[in-house]
Amino acid sequence: VKGSNLRIKVKLTLEEIANGVEKKVKVKRKVQASGVTYRSCPTCNGSGQIMKVANTILGRMQTATTCHTCSGSGQILDQKPAGADAQGMLLEDDTVSIKIPAGVVDGMQLKVAGKGNEAPGTNSIPGDLIVAIEEIEHESLKREGENLHYDLYISFAEAALGVSKEIDTVSGKVRIKLEEGIQSGKILRLKGKGIPSLNSYGNGDLLVHVNVWTPKTLNKEQKQFFEKMLTDENFIPKPEKSDKSFF
């Protein structure tokens, strides 16, 4: 007889998912009490099943049903230690180490064999611990499969002059250089800076979405500055094919 499975949730950061992690979790498991003994079930003679014979129009039919006395284990309690329940079991606190591979997905279930509840009886085997993965939302990175997305906001001046910016990745901060004249909506692809593939080699990419931030309020001098730009040929939009959004 196999013991029942236990189910828990483990919350992981995007960095832990990207790099893989070992987690120690505390669980309450049913275990056989120390000193407990079992003997063969007298109802089923240790088979765990009750054979029934019925007369039908086709002749005598034999069927097997689970023994109600031992619940199919073939054994019943002989010596019950103090504190144990009617099946000789105790509820015990246990710490389980779980190795979580890189690239797991929110909602995925991992199995830790033999770390579930034990079952009564000398020939029983413990159930499994089922671990459900729960991904913690990242402050600045959004996951899409193995790729990651990052929204980078820059000013008009930074877009016109070019700028070096520090951005978040799952392996730490990196600095990227934006060329002068970069357009809002431009997507920069950082190869291999995404999430590792769980079942194959390689990593996804990090897609940096460039957004030119427009100020909502301007003082008098700033308004005059931008009004001059309205008639400047260099500030009249002349989008090239590579600048246009793909919609």
Regions found by a protein language model. Give the residues of each.
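Non-catalytic, surface-exposed connector residues within folded enzymatic/regulatory domains
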Residues: G35-Y38, M61, N123
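Short connector loops/turns at beta-strand edges and beta->alpha or beta->beta junctions
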Residues: G46-Q49, A159
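Charged, often glycine-enriched C-terminal and inter-domain segments
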Residues: K2-K30, T65-H68, Q75-F247
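Short linker/helix segments within small regulatory modules
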Residues: N55-Q62
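Residues immediately within or flanking Cys/His clusters that coordinate Zn2+
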Residues: Y38-C41, S47, A64-C67, S73
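Single-stranded RNA-binding surfaces
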Residues: V27-T43, K52
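Intrinsically disordered, low-complexity, compositionally biased regions/tails
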Residues: I50-K52, I76
